Amino acid sequence: MTENQLYPMSSEFFDTGSNSSSNTLKYDLYSLGSTVVGAALPTLTINTGYGSSSSNNNNTNNNNNNSSSHSSSSNCSTSTTNTCNVMLSTTAITIPRSSNHNQIHHHPYQQSDLQTPRHHPSPLHTLPSMTHQQNQLQQQQQQQHHNQQQQLQQSHLALGELSDFGLDALDAASLSPTLLQDVSLSAVSPLSTTLYNGNTSGAGSSNGIGSGSGGYFTPDMSHSLSLNVVSEQVLLQEATTPNELLYEMTPNSNAMWSDISSAIIHTKHEPFSLDDDYIFPNDKAEIQAADLSDLNGGDFLDVIGNIEDFLPQTAVTQSVNFLLSPQAQGQDALVAPPMELLQQQQQNHQQLQVGSLPQLQTLLTLSQQQQSNSSSTSPYEIYHSTPQKPQQQQLSASFSPGSQASQSPLTPPPPPHANRPQYQMVKSRNMQELIKKGFPMSSPPERSILSQSAALSPGGSSGFGSSASGNSTTTSNQTSGSAVRKSFGYQSAVENSQLSRLSSSAPTHLGLEHIWMRREPRQHLLSTGSLAEAESFSSLSTGSVLSPDGIDFSQDDEDDNSSENSDNYDDCSSDNGLSEDEDETRTSTPNHLSSSKGKERFFWQYNVQAKGPKGKRLVFQSKLEDPHVLNEVTDPVFSPTCSVRGIKVYKHSGKARKGDGNDLTPNARKLHNIGKELDKLSRTINDMTPVSELPFNVRPKSRKEKNKLASRACRLKKKAQHEANKIKLFGLEIEHSEFNVKAVEISYNPSIFVL
């Protein structure tokens, strides 16, 4: 509502030797700065208030600080009148100016009583009164005083207690300026806070003579300077004498860190921001405790429905109660446990009896010791790979290999600057929310064996757990389908099943079908009909057609079920070049296709549409034919029964093949020679220096040569595919004729048919 104006002031402005009558403003400001604050403070902030009423009170005793209409305009009351800030320094003076020009103008230092023997300074800038906003400002000031009283009553947290936030005294002392800017300064007294308390008890004379000393306020700098309060009650009642100093300076007071500590506790009410994809990796050194093979039988799985019962109850109480409601917690509020945890503990004691399981208690004790040893000692440790990781994170990686990167929304990762045992408490809090929503926490044995054994197994990162898979029984295999389905998502509520307690960190958005799809990568069908893995590989890599073990064409029999319009096309460009492992893949057998990451593609498997279709795709006429009679071999380029989309019938896009492309006689030797040529090209391209390592003036030439070799390799591969199709066609014709002969023999003599 107000607008500040800066007036530069030179050093001669405060010259005490100059005549004070020549410059009235210099006299007033200098006397003000010297009598009230003194030379010790280089910057002075003054709150001045003006009474809007023009009537004067002639009573000798005016003790009502909340009524501005009965007080003189020279006697300012900070709790009721309009305030304005005047910043006085050695270089500049800030005088607020009201934006409302419709009010009556008067000087802020001018007194309504003409009998007051005060010095009247010349008006610098007239400031209007704001009578219509008096009530609004009064409410704001009362609210501000109320907030200050609450802050005085609340106990400040010492620096030694910042360990709850993952900070100690050394970490707090090394905070960066960016963190200091992030701290909310609402706990520190703002600029509009009353620094001088008005006193009307001794300044209520009718002629205003006594207002010379009482009109200026007593400084209140308890928040900004961290001073020792002599009498807080006297300060709140504002009944002190005009010139009495209420506070004593402490020379060793650390004002900045006290304000930061109070701001961290009392102003950061929002929860910690957690990232959904934040996962702690597991370490083998931490999970060397007793596994399932060390336990006698699987009976302990029937009663281990709640593993949080074996955690320290004191840590549960303090961490959950403080992390979830920091604004309502004091120093003594962390002692009493919440009622929800007590109710949960009673329910768990009624359901579970674990006193007769010494081995289980030993296992849980070891896990607790590991968790206590894995607590972070540095706030930067959690962002790097550390040797200690929480053991309960195995569950997120124990169901499917693709579920390591998925994080359940029910279990958030631990917040930064927080101890890792507190993450256990947040997890228990999530379990309480599930109890409120109606999810029972104790699962029957036949449905909880799989999820609990996978969660407790040391090898939680490999499928369903390496140790759990090695010690699996018939019962776990029979109930694996139902247990996986019930432990994922909210399907358990729909199908009236039990939700396992240890399955809260598993992905909840996947069904059983998606799990199996993610568990085993599906083989993609290429346009040539051969099966290959989904990995990226070179289109010029060779296969095992020339290996001494013989050729297995079993995988090429899938051509009839393949899609020629597959989107998984390989790129036959100079960037990919030829495969570096060509010599190794040539000597490998087709039986190793599933374990060599797809680099065993046969060299004749050329993708016709690697760069997209060169022309229009051909459309063949489909009709019912006799399966016992083979069609005549026709070239689709010259076939009269073949049409092209978008072009007239009997037309084709592209040119006819050169050479013996239309000769369908199988020639295995020609295919062998093409394979040799591809090997030579592969070695030549791989031996070339990479373009990025060459000088700039040689790069274009080298790139051009490499593109030529790659183009020749693509053409050879296309020819190899054509030759391979000829051989395949010849073999299919022979096999078809043999089946026809057998069918005719069976039709004449059914007794020879043997199943």
From Swiss-Prot:
Residues 699-708 are annotated as: Basic motif. InterPro entries: bZIP, CREBRF. Belongs to the bZIP family. CREBRF subfamily. This is Protein CREBRF homolog. GO terms for molecular function: DNA-binding transcription factor activity, RNA polymerase II-specific; protein heterodimerization activity; RNA polymerase II transcription regulatory region sequence-specific DNA binding. Residues 709-716 are annotated as: Leucine-zipper. Interacts (via C-terminus) with REPTOR-BP (via C-terminus). Interacts with the TORC1 complex component raptor. Interacts (when phosphorylated) with 14-3-3zeta, this interaction may assist its cytoplasmic retention. The gene is REPTOR. The keyword Transcription regulation applies. Phosphorylation by the TORC1 kinase complex at Ser-527 and Ser-530 abolishes nuclear localization. Upon TORC1 inhibition, dephosphorylated in a mts/PP2a-dependent manner leading to nuclear localization. Transcriptional regulator that acts in the TORC1 signaling pathway to regulate energy homeostasis and promote survival during nutrient deprivation. Interacts with REPTOR to form a transcriptional activator complex that functions downstream of TORC1 to up-regulate the expression of most target genes induced by TORC1 inhibition. In the complex, acts as the transcriptional activator. Under normal conditions TORC1 is active, inhibiting the formation of the REPTOR/REPTOR-BP complex by phosphorylating REPTOR and mediates its cytoplasmic retention by forming a docking site for 14-3-3 proteins. Disruption phenotype: Sensitive to nutrient stress. Larvae display no obvious phenotype under normal feeding conditions; larval growth and development is normal, and there is no effect on triglyceride and glycogen levels. However when mutants pupate and become adults they display reduced triglyceride and glycogen stores leading to adults dying within 18 hours of starvation whereas controls survive 2.5 days without food. Larvae are also sensitive to nutrient stress displaying 50% lethality when fed a low nutrient diet. Keywords: Chromosome, Cytoplasm, DNA-binding, Nucleus, Phosphoprotein, Transcription, Transcription regulation.
